[in-house]
């Protein structure tokens, strides 16, 4: 028997051990657990604001921690910081590369970041002495496009890339502190845990991974999707994650039980998911789809309880405010809408 065959058998045995361990953790099912829960009822939300100003597809958005400002990135080569109360543009930042795929707001409100097919993460200071917004750093070491970025604080940012890696950067020095290797397909999205100690990534290898920021190691891997994972987010308490995929489903994975709890899908939905976000309580899951809609799911019962339909093209990004009072959707129709 060849060495390869031996290793293959060993791998299969290990897989079986993992499956058994997961079964032992599954002392109940989510459906059993929530059978006594009140039904959410129909969730109806209205468009409260429409943010007009981009001249092309919007690819990404991210709320500031004040639940008032948000940043959006568009194919028109602009990064716009909006005041969602008044719909005024606080900053319109022309980008060096218009092929932007992601943007992020720093928790402090001092910086925004973006990146895309230029393989770089550009950091912009919003609080410069001169009052104008300027590039404070360009972080380049990825060998593929930048798919997502999220600040940990004003000096640390995590990025995911088409080169299959994620990276933690020291913004001051412009250097990568840690490279997170393990995915076997383009890394499409990432999300940081509520305590900023962990982050999760979703990739075109159809897996999601949980990483330890300080140790630089992969703690857990979650499989089950049948196609690329485009979007990922943490449950508000940080103990579960949700993924959205081109296989037309979202899935909920529990970190402690190390397995999938439920999937959110419907026979009538046949298109991919671009973006996912939970309500503040975690009871509602918002998911943006290629069919121009945003579906609202009861995360516990797995039923669709509402739909946000106001866009004339793909919903490319969405986000819930830190105070839980509003959800914003961004679309290829060039508009952002704020709902509640």
UniProtKB/Swiss-Prot annotation:
Pfam families: WD40_Gbeta. WD repeats lie at residues 53-83, 95-125, 141-170, 182-212, 224-254, 268-298, 310-340. InterPro entries: G-protein_beta_WD-40_rep, Gprotein_B, Guanine_nucleotide-bd_bsu, WD40/YVTN_repeat-like_dom_sf, WD40_repeat_CS, WD40_repeat_dom_sf, WD40_rpt. It comes from the Eukaryota. Its main location: cytoplasm. GO terms for cellular component: cytoplasm; heterotrimeric G-protein complex; perinuclear region of cytoplasm. Gene3D superfamilies: YVTN repeat-like/Quinoprotein amine dehydrogenase (2.130.10.10). One of its GO terms (molecular function) is signaling receptor complex adaptor activity. SUPFAM superfamilies: WD40 repeat-like (SSF50978). Keywords: Cytoplasm, Repeat, Transducer, WD repeat. The keyword Repeat applies. Signal peptide: none annotated. It is found in: Cytoplasm, Perinuclear region. GO terms for biological process: G protein-coupled receptor signaling pathway. Belongs to the WD repeat G protein beta family. G proteins are composed of 3 units, alpha, beta and gamma. Interacts with RASD2. Guanine nucleotide-binding proteins (G proteins) are involved as a modulator or transducer in various transmembrane signaling systems. The beta and gamma chains are required for the GTPase activity, for replacement of GDP by GTP, and for G protein-effector interaction. This is Guanine nucleotide-binding protein G(I)/G(S)/G(T) subunit beta-3. The gene is GNB3.
């Amino acid at each position: 028997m060849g060495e390869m065959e031996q290793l293959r058998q060993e791998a299969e045995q290990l897989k079986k051990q993992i499956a058994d361990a997961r079964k032992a953790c599954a002392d109940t099912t989510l459906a059993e657990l929530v059978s006594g829960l009140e039904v959410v009822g129909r969730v109806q939300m209205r468009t409260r604001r429409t943010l007009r100003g981009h001249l092309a597809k919007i690819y990404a958005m991210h709320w500031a921690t004040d639940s008032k400002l948000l940043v959006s990135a568009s194919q028109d080569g602009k990064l716009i910081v909006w005041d969602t109360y008044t719909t005024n543009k606080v900053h319109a930042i022309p980008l060096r590369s218009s092929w932007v795929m992601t943007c992020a707001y720093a928790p402090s409100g001092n910086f925004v970041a973006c990146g895309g097919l230029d393989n770089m993460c550009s950091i912009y200071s919003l609080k410069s002495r001169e009052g104008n917004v300027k590039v404070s750093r360009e972080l380049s070491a990825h060998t593929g496009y930048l798919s997502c970025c999220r600040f940990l604080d004003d000096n640390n940012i995590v990025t995911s890339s088409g080169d299959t890696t994620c990276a933690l950067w020291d913004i001051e020095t412009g250097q990568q502190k840690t490279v997170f290797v393990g995915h076997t397909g383009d890394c499409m999205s990432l999300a940081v845990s509520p305590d900023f100690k962990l982050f999760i990534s979703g990739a075109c290898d159809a897996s999601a991974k949980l990483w330890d920021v300080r140790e630089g190691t992969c703690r857990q891997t979650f499989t089950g999707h049948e196609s690329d994972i485009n979007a990922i987010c943490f449950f508000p308490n940080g103990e579960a994650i949700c993924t959205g995929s081109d296989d037309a489903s979202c899935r909920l994975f529990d970190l402690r039980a190390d397995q999938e709890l439920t999937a959110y899908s419907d026979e009538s939905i046949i298109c991919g998911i671009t973006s996912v976000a939970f309500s503040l309580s975690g009871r509602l899951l918002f998911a943006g789809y290629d069919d121009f809609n945003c579906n609202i799911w009861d995360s516990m019962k797995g039923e669709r309880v509402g739909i946000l339909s106001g866009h004339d093209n793909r919903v490319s990004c969405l986000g819930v405010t830190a105070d839980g009072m509003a959800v914003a959707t961004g679309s290829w129709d060039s508009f952002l809408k704020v709902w509640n």
